[in-house]
Amino acid sequence: MNWNLVFDGLIGYLCLLILLTFHEAAHAWTAWKCGDDTAYQEGRVSLNPVVHMDMLGTVILPLAVVLLGAAGSGMGRFIIGWGKPVPVYLGNLRKPRLQDTLIAVAGPAMNLILAVALMFLARVFVSAEMSQMAYVVVRMSQISLLLCFFNLLPIPPLDGSHVLKNFIGMSDETYIRISQFGFIIVIVLIQLQLVSAIINYSTRLTFMMIERLVGLPLVGMA
């Protein structure tokens, strides 16, 4: 066990926890503004990480990735996870398909916004010659982009599946049936080289674009 990698992985986990909190809060806030106060009544329009935590997606899987990475599997650098799904009652929405899509996209959009904001913050740290802080913030930006593209996978109950469901007009009954096995499918698919390559390529490309936007020629993802 490499304890330096454990420490590095735990920093990544704390970054993930913060990013997931903003991600889920964005879903809840958007649902509230679209007319469904279900998540609001459950206290999900909040930046308190505890209310958004999912035992498997926020605790078990990410920490397992940290430990496996420290044991030499090479997994620890690209830590991913998910929060507790935000409840949305479509009957409260004025335009269910459109607004459900907006609610779904809000999470990944928040991650993209955070990735850009964090890179601007990294530029401040670089100017102040605070290289360690710059490294942490850049890594947090990378994790935010990973979360963005991971959640856009069209597999229930990830955000991309809501976009696909509303685009093709899938029935709620069919979606619910598929969702019962969704996270099993997700865990299997992210082990496939093609799927991980698509996520990593999208993340790298977007990260390089943000680097150019910010004007911060840092070392990209290795």
Label the model's feature ranges.
Residues 1-222:
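Hydrophobic transmembrane alpha-helices and their immediate loop junctions
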